[in-house]
Regions:
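Long, compositionally biased stretches
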Residues: 1-52, 72-135
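Extended catalytic/binding region for NAD+/ADP-ribose chemistry, centered on the ART fold
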Residues: 54-59
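Short active-site loop/helix that positions an aromatic residue
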Residues: 61-71
Length: 135
């Protein structure tokens, strides 16, 4: 439940996360944040650590309070993915992550104060990781 909706969609509060999972239960690659209020709306999202291993945005504690008690076991941080016809232009938005408490089923999209880009290009990073993994 996103009490305040998400940026650009303030009336979409109910979402489900659709993911293809690895053996450890973590999402692999791109997942979908599917609106239950507006069935035609689904947003591609991914774990930012897949493309920026040092991604640690500073988030004010009061922004996280509505989500309940967060810990490494129940927190998901996801970023939106933007794809164009040219797949090499694939990018993620590191400026406005989604913070989700999986146990409480509550989420919030936050604009972080850190100097992260709205368009962080990821195609080459993902391609290199696939090649490393032999895929």
């Amino acid at each position: 439940f996103f009490e305040k909706g998400i940026i650009g969609f303030p009336d979409c509060n109910q979402f489900t996360l659709i993911s293809d999972l690895k053996e450890d239960g973590s999402p692999k690659g791109i997942s979908w944040l599917q609106s239950l209020d507006e069935p035609a709306f689904a947003l591609p999202v991914m774990d930012p650590l897949l493309v920026k291993e040092d991604y640690r945005p500073w988030i004010a504690e009061e922004m996280l309070k509505p989500l309940g008690d967060l810990n490494e076991e129940n927190i998901y941080i996801l970023v939106s993915v933007t794809a164009t016809e040219d797949i090499t232009k694939l990018s993620v938005n590191l400026k406005a992550p989604f913070i989700i408490n999986a146990e409480e089923r509550k989420g919030h999209q936050i604009i972080v104060e850190d100097d992260f880009p709205v368009k962080f290009m990821v195609y080459d990073i993902l391609k290199a990781k696939k090649e490393e993994a032999g895929e």
